[in-house]
């Protein structure tokens, strides 16, 4: 298992991830006030990690965070997540223990076209249990995005 804590531009924010190849998943954990730059930096750090694989499942824990994102920020992040080097073919499981974070994650799932393979839970325990039971199932309706389509969308955002 690999644990990485990186420096992020937002003061009062603590973010880290770990990649567990044996369990075929990565875990992202956030604390404090988190904005678009924090999330994009995490995505970029994981994508450049030699342990990263698009075949991993993801558990993203937003239970101890205040998300500071506009609707435009959510759209920008969704387009970054659709870019080939950041895409995953596995399940995306989020922990969102309040309605604001839940709504933001739903918007993100819609704009990144991940609604079919994304699940949101109130607690970390519920999320981990669900992921363990569904780890061997292929997420439904997974659609490969052509790299030219993703590149064009990314150019328009960045």
Ranges and model annotations:
Residues 2-158:
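Amphipathic, Lys/Arg-enriched alpha-helical "gate/interface" segment within cytosolic domains
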